[in-house]
């Protein structure tokens, strides 16, 4: 039984082209349902791909093109709050932020903005180990 993610969850990886994001995206895809990792986001690498996964310039573009409903974030601390807000503003159902070391003030601003928007996005993290539904999905 899945609660947050399952075999139909479609995932965007923000920071997929970095060392950590690439490693963990490959590991998650190897675990189960590789085709459910549908996009990466990196504004400087938009229009390219990694392991056959298209890279988009924004989360909104990735969501519109792929039907993604979740994002996992492997962006360095200085850019992580902006990455979270981009995913929230794209109205994804779930955002999992793996990044650690995000300044507390940045996260207070993120939570405040989520309240202002009346966001329905569930944010797990930051500094989160991810989540798993056995044999269905690992983020």
Predicted regions located by residue number:
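A short, basic/flexible loop-to-alpha-helix module at the beginning of a structural domain
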Residues: 1-8, 60, 134-139
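NAD(P)-binding Rossmann-fold cofactor-contacting core
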Residues: 27-50, 126
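Rossmann-fold NAD(P)-binding glycine/threonine-rich loop
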Residues: 100-124
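Glycine-rich phosphate-binding loops of nucleotide-dependent enzymes
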Residues: 17, 51-52, 60-63, 67
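Generic hydrophobic/aromatic pocket-lining and core-packing "Φ" positions
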Residues: 25, 59, 84-88
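General beta-strand structural signal in soluble alpha/beta enzymes
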Residues: 13, 39-42, 95-97, 122-127, ...
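Rossmann-fold NAD(P) dinucleotide-binding segment
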Residues: 64-70, 74, 78-101
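Glycine-rich adenosine-cofactor-binding loop
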Residues: 9-24
């Amino acid at each position: 039984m899945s609660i947050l993610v399952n075999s139909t969850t479609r995932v965007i990886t923000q920071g997929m082209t970095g060392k950590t994001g690439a490693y963990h995206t490959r590991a998650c895809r190897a675990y189960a349902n590789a085709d459910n990792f549908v996009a990466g986001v990196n504004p400087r690498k938009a229009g390219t791909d990694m392991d056959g996964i298209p890279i988009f310039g924004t989360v909104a573009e990735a969501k519109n093109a792929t039907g993604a409903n979740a994002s996992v974030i492997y962006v360095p601390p200085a850019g992580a709050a902006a990455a979270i807000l981009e995913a929230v503003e794209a109205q994804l159902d779930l955002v999992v932020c793996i990044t650690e070391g995000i300044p507390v003030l940045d996260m207070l601003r993120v939570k405040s903005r989520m309240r202002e928007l009346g966001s329905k996005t569930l944010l797990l993290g930051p500094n989160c180990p991810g989540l798993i539904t056995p044999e269905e999905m690992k983020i």
